[in-house]
């Protein structure tokens, strides 16, 4: 469903294989360059009994939500890269997949090419997860890294990110933290078997970061990074927040360059494990979509959790020192 940047990457991967076949591509316009049937009629796809899996790479809320629900109700597995829908409708979509005995997998929604959710799922098979944390947005990491290493102002670093294709023409959802918050919500829901409401997550983006803040961090032997964090509380609630943080220079997170991500799991017994790689892009994201399809083909059709429960976000117990910039005369 969709054959743009990510969908085109999935198409190329499938064309190189002999064990998978694309039955249809859903597109609003003719695509004569594609070696498969192209249709603008979704009902043709969902009613075809030979189609076992719908791959949703359209993005956005509608019609992606309508199509995903229809596919699940028709008994078809769904693989999606749609972090917006999976953060907003997680509980509803997982429940719908369970009721229809099909798989719903969304590894590509978090971490791009990193097998983050799959590794999180594997950890949960062994032991409880206590915390998830890390750098979940490549655009903001590129901007902060460029400001740190090249001394550029925020606006210049943003323009450079846009020129390289790391930032959208309208980068608002990256800069205000919405993109990383969605990834954090999905990770939190999977890690703790819960449903967190996205608006409850405390969120601060990087739009207010200035070169003087980067310099102040350097004087303290620290590096500014946009960090996501969620931990399970004894009450069953979840502490969940996204904010710029000054990371000590010796930490792995401080050294993450350019548009890369680094996301970590803290398990009850194994401690902290980190996963590093490209956080976005045509082939990294398509790779995770393909891995989900292979998992389904190989019988790994269960959902990330089958015991969802509502969870309240409670950050009242989180005590941390903060850096505050004050404009004024030195006294």
What does each of the following model-derived ranges do?
Residues 51, 98-179, 186:
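Rossmann-like NAD(P)H-binding beta-loop-alpha module
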Residues 156-255, 260-262:
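Substrate-binding/catalytic subdomain of NAD(P)-dependent oxidoreductase enzymes
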Residues 64-70, 74, 81-122:
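Rossmann-fold NAD(P)-binding glycine/threonine-rich loop
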Residues 1-12, 328-330:
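Glycine-rich adenosine-cofactor-binding loop
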Residues 40-81:
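Rossmann-fold NAD(P) dinucleotide-binding segment
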Residues 293-331:
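A conserved regulatory-domain signal marking ACT and ACT-like small-molecule sensing domains
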Residues 206, 271-273, 277-283:
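Glycine-rich phosphate/pyrophosphate-binding beta-alpha loops
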Residues 16-34:
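NAD(P)-binding Rossmann-fold cofactor-contacting core
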């Amino acid at each position: 469903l969709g054959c743009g940047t990510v969908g085109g990457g999935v198409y190329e991967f499938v064309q190189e294989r002999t064990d998978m076949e694309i039955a249809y591509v859903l597109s609003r316009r003719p695509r004569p360059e594609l070696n498969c049937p192209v249709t603008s009629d979704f009902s043709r796809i969902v009613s075809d009994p030979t189609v076992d899996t719908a791959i949703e790479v359209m993005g956005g809320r509608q019609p992606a939500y309508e199509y995903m629900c229809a596919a699940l109700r028709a008994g078809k597995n769904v693989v999606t890269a749609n972090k917006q829908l999976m953060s907003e409708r997680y509980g509803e979509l997982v429940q719908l997949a369970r009721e229809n005995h099909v798989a719903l997998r969304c590894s590509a929604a978090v971490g791009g090419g990193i097998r983050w959710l799959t590794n999180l799922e594997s950890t949960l098979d062994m032991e409880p997860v206590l915390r998830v944390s890390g750098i979940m947005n490549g655009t903001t990491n590129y901007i902060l890294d460029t400001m740190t290493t090249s001394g550029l102002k925020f606006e210049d670093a943003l323009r450079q990110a846009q020129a390289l294709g790391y930032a959208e023409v309208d980068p608002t959802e990256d800069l205000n933290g919405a993109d990383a918050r969605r990834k954090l919500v999905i990770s939190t829901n999977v890690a703790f078997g819960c449903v967190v409401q996205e608006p409850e997550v405390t969120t601060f983006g990087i739009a207010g970061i200035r070169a003087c803040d980067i310099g102040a961090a350097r004087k303290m032997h620290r590096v500014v990074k946009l960090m996501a964090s969620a931990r399970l509380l004894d009450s069953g609630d979840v502490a969940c927040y996204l904010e710029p943080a000054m990371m000590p220079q010796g930490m792995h997170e401080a050294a993450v360059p350019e548009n890369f991500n680094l996301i970590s799991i803290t398990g009850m017994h194994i401690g902290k494990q980190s996963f590093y790689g490209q956080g976005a892009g045509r082939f990294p994201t398509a790779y995770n979509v393909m891995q989900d399809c292979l998992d389904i083909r190989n019988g790994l059709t269960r959902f990330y959790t089958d015991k969802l429960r509502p969870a309240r976000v409670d950050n009242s117990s989180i005590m941390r020192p903060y850096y505050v910039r004050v404009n004024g005369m030195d006294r």
